[in-house]
Amino acid sequence: MFKSSICNNKLNIEEIKEKGDLPTTQEELRQRRERAETLVKKKSLLSSGASIVPIPGLDFGVDLKLMRDIIEDVNKIYGLDHDQVNSLSDQVKERIMSAAAIQGSQFIGRKVSEALLKVVIKDVAKRAAAKQTKWFPFVGQAVSASISYYFMSKLGKDHINKCEKVINNL
């Protein structure tokens, strides 16, 4: 936690504490997208940095935490986190969950830990081969860092797109 806060301070990563209301205008949606994309870029850089450290397993543990953080923070930015969705009327909650199911998102309006394992298992299989490049000094670490950044960024951008589709379908 201490190291995480140091990295967050160095990269000036915004800590998402408040839970926003559902966006109602396209301008509001655009602002939230910018905020979410900035967060995803910075968290992806952290993932990339952890990949450079030649300690087996460190990058995997950091990636798990960052995946969870990205998904939870993006949900909060869009007003689609678990607690907020559950506080809405049953009709709105049902519409959000239906729209999320149509988008194929297991993360919107739910606790992240349940669905995260399914995604992580699929993601780890893809990364495992790429991470083996660490055994080739310097070049392997650079390749590993690039792959880590790409996958973390893709996960975040895909989740942002799904959140926006859910909002637009309400």
Residue map of PLM features:
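Terminal, membrane-proximal amphipathic helices
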Residues: 1-50, 64-170
